[in-house]
Amino acid sequence: MAHASAELPPAPPEAKRWRDLRKRALSAAVLGPLALAAIWLGAHWYTLMIALGIAILAWEWVHLCGLRVRAFPGLAVPLALFASGLAAVADLHLLALLLLPAGAAAATLAARSDPRRAPGASTLWLGAGVVYIGLAGIGFIWLRSDSFAGLVAILFVVLVVWASDIGAYMVGRMVGGPKLAPAISPNKTWSGALGGLAAAVLVGLAVAAWADAEARLASVAVIAAILGTAAAAGDLLESAIKRHFHVKDSSGLIPGHGGLLDRVDGLLAAIPVACAIALVQGSARGGHGFLWT
């Protein structure tokens, strides 16, 4: 007869996956509409969302690097990002960009000179995080600063990246097949990558059709494919970073998702690419928020 204290057998892998999926869906159902509302409202609501997101990402990044946020070397990262963000909000975008390498160097030097630093702490990665997170933060602010075109551009990028992520996850689960990069992320498949790319293009076309009746759909499809590819690359990059630090998630902040960094890795890569596209395309339409001509 089994003892009362005997442990229950572990849940089957499939049951665990469905529990995780329910958690992911619930978290997305709460956070997604809040993010979209802040994007739509713009102004202080949007700036507050970006500031809060950057602060959380800085905290997660410092912990990934094996440092404490409350000690000065770790505090240098959010301070550098805060200074760069203030410059971006004030439309001093060149200054905001210049503050990133300066902040990265300051964070790295501060960490290296700290006698209390843990032996395994990574000082170079600490500085790299300032640029990695800061570029996306500046991009979010710059791209949204043009009223209607900025709103459309941010919605386009966010929805395309979300579609890429969801499409890759669902198609990869249903179809499976050859692995995309088994040494970096064993669960990602080529079928998932292609499914994510197709979803990104379809959603991009839908957003463009809603926002601009004169949009050239071929151009929109190419831009959506580029952003979807950038998002997938950002996902792989974050997987490689977590593998380097031997962690599964950047934090446990979001149930079913891990940390904020785990959820916005695609956006961190796609936003700078979108800004580069907007710089080129916007010059043809007299505004920096346009992603297509």
Label the model's feature ranges:
Residues 187-194, 252-267:
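Divalent-cation-assisted or electrostatically stabilized phosphate/pyrophosphate-binding catalytic cores
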Residues 204, 208, 274-278, 282:
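Juxtamembrane/transmembrane-helix interface segments of polytopic membrane transporters
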Residues 237-253:
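Interfacial helix-loop-helix junctions of multi-pass membrane proteins
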Residues 278-293:
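Juxtamembrane boundary at the C-terminal end of a transmembrane helix
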